[in-house]
Amino acid sequence: MRTFFCAVLLCLHVAANASSESTEMKRAIDTMQEVYHVSFVYDSALADVTPAGRPLPDKTLAENLNIVFGGTGIKWEIKDEYVLLFRQNKYTFSGYVCQDNGESLINVTVYDKTTRTGTLTDEHGFFSITLPEGKHVLRVSYIGYEEVVKELDLQSDYFGTIYLKESTTALAGVEVTANLNDPLFTTQTGKVSFTPELLNTEFSLLSSPDLVKSIQNLPGVSSGTELLSGLYVHGGRNDENMFLLDGTPLYQVNHLGGLFSAFNTDVVKNVDFYKSGFPARYGGRTASVIDVRTKEGDMKEYHGTFSIGLLDGRFQFEGPVIKDKTSFSFGMRRSWMDLLTTPVLWIANRSFSDKNIKTRYAFHDINAKITHRFSDWNKLSLSVYSARDLFKSRVLQQFPEGYMFQKYEERDENTFHIRWGNLSVGLNWNGQLTPKLSGNVSLVYARNLAKYSFLSDESYYEQDKRVSMERMQRSNYSTIDDVGYRMEFSYRPAASHHIRLGSNYLFHMYHPQRIASQDIRETAGIADTLLSAGEGRYRGSEISFYVEDDMQLTEKLRVNAGLHAVLYRVTGATYHSLEPRLSVGYRLFDWATLKASYTEMSQFAHQLSNSYLNLPTDCWVPSTSRIRPMRSRQVAGGIYMKLPWNLSMDIEGYFRTTDRMLEYDTGGSLTLPADNWEKWVRVGKGKSYGLEASLAYRHAKNVFQASYTLSWSKQKFEDFYPDWYASKFDNRHKLNLMFRHKFNNRIDAYAAWTFRSGDRATVPMQYVENPSLPGTVQPSDAAGSWVYEKPNNITLPAYHRLDVGINFRRTTKRGFERIWNISIYNAYCRMNAFYTQVERQADGSFRGKAIGLFPVIPSFSYTLKF
């Protein structure tokens, strides 16, 4: 908090110095009075307005009056030897920016060339800009779309919808002029936005575009275990990332243990990723925020996308229900793995006379949304998201009488069944309340589920009559149910202020574990049954309020200041948190901006895991009376530059601390005890710091990006180890290189090379055998003990790989686009470390041996856009 107030005082000091520059208006007036021998009559408050320019020699009085006051909101009138100054009336131009099919667009720049002020559309495509009365020329631009220039003569408040057409010549990613979402113009540090075009032109693992794997390539982000969808941002852990899908929080965002993320990029409209400089409207996690917005659907025509790849297929379709009034968007993705393995197992089972194996794995995710517009400024939408993974395995074996000297025939059955996933439903209203005020209210429900069961049945038969049976059955059920609302308001009193305020509420129902077991022994018709069960259940409510103001204090200084307040109640405990947020941007030159930010974040939900594999056995637990909420503080700052030759460069540093981190320790067990789980966790703290740099070149045919991260990530759990030690994913160096080339409108290719320092692992230094005392018998577990220097004491070999791919495009006579993609993962077959084996040397010392699993992996996909 002390750092926050120091930053505020510094900001006020800079603002005070900047306001002193407003005396330029007084000097300009004095100069014209002296040169033209006139007297100015005006309200003294007008002297605080920054002049549009300075008086020039060899100009008439009227010409210089236009130079000084043009676009400032000050009107002038010459009467004899007097110049009368008075404020112009101001009016608000507001509305929505949409594609020509009615789909709203996010982060569109609306810029007034007359006053040299502008704004961005929000997450619902809404904008509002207050301008002086009179004539204005507005430029509306967005990457990948044709720019629209609109001339206005404002004599009253005006509402309008602006439609943009997709560009047929510009390559997605090419810069547009006056892009106010560019880091050069925003205050936030560590923010990156993704459009659908950008997501679908990134490297695609197994030829399937993936949002999380695109984020993994950013500086300051570690991917964790190879091929999995881990996100370790600025030293944070995988559970410290807030995923929002149309405003609804998600807990499980992976398929197949992380091989695929749970986002179908065909339905994604925009993604905002924050790793520092968090605005006050976000909360609930401590490391990052991923705000995903999905399509509403085409209001005019039907169209869609179909894609089939090596392991999965995707389908997306959208169109009008009532033209220009109601639209729908539907997307589905499903894996093919069960269809591929079924014939293989059928052939294998035919070769076994005493064994039958049935295995099935499949996943799907479904996105559905329907939107109705009551008017141009009032709409309602209902969205549903469902994601599910399913794995089944059943092995039947028969052993004839006499096998291994058995008296009876034996029949064994082992069944394993696991499913996990998400379900979320959101009802959202969005509308314009006044020309300067818009509102958004959502009712949300989310459910996270993980369930697995195991059955082992051994039966013995004599002449097809069962004589005995042993059955063991285990089941585990874990759920989280959230229900609540989100209320957001956006108020733009002037072009220099954008105020956001709102409230979020969630009622949490946690069931971390519901464990049941059953053991049955039956002999000669007499059964002996043993039952046991356990359940953990928690209820909690979380309500937050926030306010933030994005302020343009001077032509060069921009500030985003806000406060996020949270009240959290769970059985037996109540917590509250005040989280200040401050981001400052200062325009050093036309081509460079200096930024700094300070943020505090709290987290009331924790994921307990004994691995880094994103397993469904991982479960979520709330903060309790014994486990306090996690808290992080982060300072970040850097310089952002637009250089000649289509180059851009960013350099950013950060320092982050985390208190009350949790670490799960049950001696290697993957399942959490249902009761008293709090005694199985350690509480500690962490710190991370580093420097990030990125360089990008964008041209119509060539795109090159390079990023480098130098970072340290440490943690301390005093009950486990008394000093600071490196985190598992303390990757000192990380380098990403990407190049994409467009040969023509039909062929484009890309290559991406990734390098990072190796992950950390723990290897014992020696093994000490306990002495055996005469006349005593040592238990088997007391034979000796391992001696460790410290946790994560070795660094595995460096990780690096090359991915390449090529797209072949063709447009049919009917206007359909066909895309063939061929990709190669790990092109030079680097066997990077996936896990570590500990080997004992001849001299008694130990060494870790890195084991790699993933060689070169080719893949393909076919996409049809219709």
Sequence positions of predicted segments:
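Surface-exposed extracellular loop regions of Gram-negative outer-membrane beta-barrel proteins
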Residues: 401, 449, 516, 590-635, ...
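Periplasmic N-terminal accessory/gating domains of Gram-negative outer-membrane beta-barrel systems
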Residues: 69-70, 120, 146, 182-239, ...
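Transmembrane beta-barrel wall of Gram-negative outer-membrane proteins
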Residues: 311-335, 350-394, 417-445, 493-494
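Short, acidic, small-residue-rich periplasmic hinge/interaction motif at the N-terminus
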Residues: 29-36, 72, 78, 83-84, ...
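Outer membrane beta-barrel strand-and-loop segments of large Gram-negative receptors
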Residues: 482-486, 534-538, 624, 628, ...
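Short, acidic Ser/Thr/Gly-rich low-complexity loop/linker segments typical of extracellular
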Residues: 114-126
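Gram-negative outer-membrane beta-barrel transporters
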Residues: 555, 655-657, 677-763
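C-terminal beta-signal and adjacent terminal beta-strands/loops
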Residues: 659, 746, 755-782, 797-803, ...
